[in-house]
Regions:
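Short catalytic/signature loops enriched in Gly
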Residues: 399-422
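Glycine- and acidic/polar-rich repeat regions and solenoidal domains
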Residues: 56-64, 76, 81-92, 106-128, ...
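Surface beta-loop-beta hairpin patches that serve as ligand-binding interfaces in beta-rich domains
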Residues: 414-468
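Beta-solenoid repeat scaffold
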Residues: 41-82, 91-101
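Bacterial N-terminal signal peptides that target proteins for export
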Residues: 1-11
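Acidic Gly/Asp/Thr-rich repetitive segments characteristic of extracellular carbohydrate-active
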Residues: 22-61, 88, 414, 432, ...
Length: 468
């Protein structure tokens, strides 16, 4: 389904060796830092002593490490070395296997044509930002981190306290129609991004309209989003072949929006008190997700064009979406499509094996769903909006019970157990990251089990710079 990344023993040993190497270089000024970077060779470890460093020019990195001997540039202590001023690190096209670790960034945000922000340029590869604190300043607009290079890893960082227009993370690529490849974003916390009253204010944006038909193969997993609503799209997907899994969205976050692009996969995420998930494009797979107390649960977009015949900026009519094995509990609008003037609706949608329970409007479809299948969904609560889709629901109590961690799970004798309709061979795990059977799966996001779940609602202690 996607690539898997694991640290080999050799990489772990080489990292430990680098930490105690006699080649470690301590610096205490930006001039010393730039000089040390310019002469860095594979395995170099440059340590910036604690303090505040006011940068007026970019800290330029063009050096190459190797997979086993990365060039590591780290703060003496996490958050102890602060980069303030006009600009931060600029990883240029030659940079490879470079790690930036433990800094606090409070310098100016980035505007693409003018520089600023943290930047991994096109041509850079296998670069990593880990255990940093991003709290960049900016009076008007700008991004925190821009990525155009391939095989970037962004992990265990805090992206926090953004109050201006611009994304926290924006991913571009090497040209106007190609995407950076295989970005891996994991174990980060994104928090406190209130409404910036403008567009392009997502926590993460992967692509832009002009690149939206290009594959990016990004993996966004195990991140925690709290109070992120810079705009209506908390995550804005504008490219193809990306995966979003094992993330937690809570406390008034805006939506995960599949705004452009095809063949994206969203599974085993927790949406708690948010605007849920919205989708446009073709052949996305949405499964094993958990929605509770959301203003919107699953929002099927009402298209106004059909890409590629229509403009890439259009709302591409949803086509071939598979929405299966999700659990939606106590949401204001559980499953919806908003009306649109001259809207094209959606087509070839499969909505099967979901649980919809409680809430105000369980189904509110205000547009066409041609050639679509709504079947074998468990439905419990009022019947607002069900209408023509009533035959696709089984009206029976799914017997859900909240566990000690706060999630609703199936109980014994639930009518969901072993009653999913066939197919969906790609649905291999449930919301707990526990295996589903090949044949008799359970309806909804949870596969009944007495085992301890592997995937749970994330807490602040499990993500960010100070997490294990």
């Amino acid at each position: 389904m996607h690539f898997t990344r694991k640290l080999s023993l050799a990489v772990i040993l080489s990292t430990v060796a680098a930490a105690v190497s006699a080649a470690d270089i301590k610096v205490s000024s930006l001039d010393e830092l730039q000089t040390a970077i310019n002469s860095a060779t594979p395995g170099a470890h440059i340590i910036v002593v604690d303090g505040v460093y006011d940068a007026t020019n970019p800290i330029v990195i063009s050096q190459k490490g190797t997979a086993h001997k990365p060039v590591v540039i780290s703060a003496e202590n996490i958050g102890g070395a602060e980069i303030s001023g006009a600009i931060g690190f600029l990883l240029k096209s030659n940079a490879a296997y470079v790690t930036i670790e433990g800094f606090k960034f409070t310098h100016a945000t980035g505007i693409e044509e003018h520089g600023g922000g943290e930047m991994i340029g096109a041509g850079a590869s296998h670069c990593r930002y880990t255990r940093n604190i991003f709290e960049l300043s900016g009076k008007s607009r700008g991004y925190y981190l821009m990525i155009s290079g391939d095989d970037t890893e962004i992990d265990h960082n805090s992206f926090q306290n953004k109050f201006t227009i611009g994304q926290m993370i924006i991913i571009h690529g090497p040209s106007t129609n190609l995407m950076a490849q295989r970005t891996w974003i994991h174990q980060n916390i994104f928090t406190n991004f209130p409404d910036a009253h403008g567009n392009n204010c997502s926590s993460i944006q992967i692509g832009v309209s002009g690149r939206s038909l290009s594959p990016a193969h990004a993996l966004v997993e195990n991140n925690l989003f709290i109070r992120c609503r810079g705009e209506n799209e908390n995550i804005c997907n504008k490219s193809c072949d990306n995966i979003y899994r094992f993330n937690t969205f809570e406390d008034n976050c805006s939506e995960l929006s599949l705004r452009h692009g095809d063949r994206n996969i969203v599974y085993a995420n927790f949406f708690l008190g948010t605007d849920g998930l919205r989708m446009f494009g073709k052949n996305d797979k949405i499964f094993s997700n958990y929605f509770e107390d959301c203003h919107r649960g699953i929002h099927i977009g009402n298209g106004d064009g059909v890409v590629p015949a229509s403009k890439l900026t259009s709302h591409d009519r949803p086509d071939g979406m598979q929405i299966a094995f999700n659990t939606i509990v106590n949401c204001t609008n559980s499953v919806m499509m908003l009306a649109r003037r001259n809207g094209l609706g959606a087509t070839n949608i499969i909505f099967k094996n979901n649980i919809v329970a409680g809430g105000k409007n369980l189904v509110a479809i205000e547009g066409a769903m041609t050639h679509s299948v709504v079947k074998n969904n468990l439905f419990w609560g009022n019947t607002n909006g069900v209408g023509e889709y009533a035959s696709g629901f089984i009206f029976e109590d799914p017997k859900l019970k909240r566990d000690a961690n706060g999630e609703f799970h199936l109980q014994k004798r639930s009518p969901a157990i072993n009653h999913a309709s066939g197919g969906f061979s790609y649905v291999k795990v449930d919301m707990d990251d526990q295996k589903r059977g090949w044949w008799k799966k359970d309806i909804g996001a949870d596969e009944f089990s007495t085992k301890i779940p592997k995937n749970r609602i994330l807490t602040v202690a499990e993500v960010g710079p100070f997490a294990p």
